[in-house]
C-alpha cells in the first residue's frame, strides 16, 4: 500500500496562516491524498490542516515580550519537533517567522527530512550572510521578491522566486468609488489615508507627526477627508488619543477598525510607515509618501556599523530601483516636509498617472500565481511513490 504524502507546516503569524492555507489548497490539487499537520490558524484549519498548536501561540513581538514568553515558546518547539518526527513527514515547511522556524528546520534537516522556508528574510536589506545559515537549515527557499534568489545563488543555495500572493489577490485595476461608498466618504472630495504602522512603538514615533502633517495639508485642501485605519484593537486607543490632540477638523477625520486596504483604495494619496503597507499601496496604484523613525541610538548603531545594505527603504522604490515614492527618514520626517510631499501628489495629477503606469509594471512582475508556484517547488522535493 502506497503511503499518502505527509506534509508538516509551521505558520508563526497571521500572514503565514494565510499563505499556508493557499499553499495547502494548491498542494491538494496535485496530491489529493496528502495529509497536513502543524502549527496554523483558522485559515489553515479551513484548508483541512490538523493543527497541533495555534499560530497565535507563536505571535509575540519585541525582545522583552519574547523573553517573557521564551519558556513557553521553547516548550512548543520541543513538543512540535517530537510529535512531528514521530509522524514521519516527507517535508517540513516553515512559513516566514525565521526566528522560530529556521531552528526547527535545521533540526529536521539534520534528521534527513526535506525542509523548505517560504518567505525569505530581508537578506537584501541587511545581514546578507544570513543566507548561508538559512541554507544550512533548508533544502529550498521560496522567495516573494525577484532580487532574492540571486543573493542565495552566491552562497550555492537553492532559492525560487514564486511571486507575491498579495499581487495575485489585488486586481490590476481598482475601484475607488466603491471603497468611498463603503466608508461613507464623498466621491469628489480629496482623501488622504494615514497609516503610521501596526506596532505601538511605530505609532508612538510617527502617529502625531503624521496627523500634524495631515492637519497642515487640510489648510491647503479645503474639504480634505483623512482616514486612519487602526491595524488592531491594541493600537486604536493610542491613535484616538493622538487624533484628539491634532489640528484635523473632527468632521473630516475618520478612525477606522482594521480597514487598511479599503482606506487606501478610497484615498487619493497615502501617508504610510515604511513596511509591507507600502507594497500594498503600490499594488493598489496609490501615490504615497513613505516615512520612518526609530530611536536615535538605534539609528546611530545601524549607521555606524553599516548594518543596512540599501540606499532606499520603501519596497516600491527597492523593487523599481528608483525613487518612485518620497522617503522621509529620521530627522527629515517632519510635519512640514511630509505635508509638502503629499501636496505635490495632490497638485500634479499627471505625475500620478505616470506613477500608476510604473506601479502596474511592478505589479505584473510580482504576479506569478505564488501559491501554485510554491506548491510546484515543494512537490518536486517529495519522494516519488
UniProtKB/Swiss-Prot annotation:
InterPro entries (UniProt xref): Glyco_trans_19
Pfam families from the UniProt entry: LpxB (PF02684)
Gene Ontology MF annotations: lipid-A-disaccharide synthase activity; phospholipid binding
Keyword Cell membrane: no
Catalytic activity: a lipid X + a UDP-2-N,3-O-bis[(3R)-3-hydroxyacyl]-alpha-D-glucosamine = a lipid A disaccharide + UDP + H(+)
UniProt name for this protein: Lipid-A-disaccharide synthase
TM spans (from-to): none
Organism (species): Xylella fastidiosa (strain 9a5c)
Database matches in NCBIfam families: lpxB
EC numbers for this chain: 2.4.1.182
Keyword Iron-sulfur: no
Function: Condensation of UDP-2,3-diacylglucosamine and 2,3-diacylglucosamine-1-phosphate to form lipid A disaccharide, a precursor of lipid A, a phosphorylated glycolipid that anchors the lipopolysaccharide to the outer membrane of the cell.
Similarity annotation: Belongs to the LpxB family.
Any Gene Ontology biological process: lipid A biosynthetic process
Keywords, ordered alphabetically: Glycosyltransferase, Lipid A biosynthesis, Lipid biosynthesis, Lipid metabolism, Transferase
UniProt pathway annotation: Bacterial outer membrane biogenesis; LPS lipid A biosynthesis
GO cellular component: membrane
